[in-house]
Amino acid sequence: SPEAMRRTLDEMAHTTLLQLFKEKPEARALFDKSAGYAVFDSRKVAFILAAGFGRGVAVDRSTQQKTYMKMASVGVGITFGVGNFDNKIVILIQEQADFDTFISNTQDARMDGKAILGDSKEEASGSFVDGRKYYVLTRKGWAVTASVTGVNYLRDDYLN
């Protein structure tokens, strides 16, 4: 049911944020400065053509209004590794206007994905890049980047 799915997504988002703050304490300062955030549970299938899908929830920090969302990605190459596996994505969004755009069915075209494979200079900076910060929980732990892969984020009409 939609209610059960919303509860599951809310619990996943809460648990993922707690894990992020415990394992990457510096993320808390950016979270506190953000206008909103989104947490997705995604499954990646990555061989030559990488594809991914998932669901999540975006939260406006000023109102606590939740928007349930779907995500889908397609790219060429091995972006997240070989095989079929899950990961969690936390997106911190700095400005309210950017958050509002994000929850209004958006395609994130700023992607490069390289930082997901290892540490990056962006991780050390502790700041937003182009108004966002992405934390990706992979099998190896948290990776930090300014972007993920070419991803469509869409409002989930079934859950909203």
Segments from the language model and where they lie:
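Small-residue-enriched, tightly packed secondary-structure blocks
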Residues: S1-N160
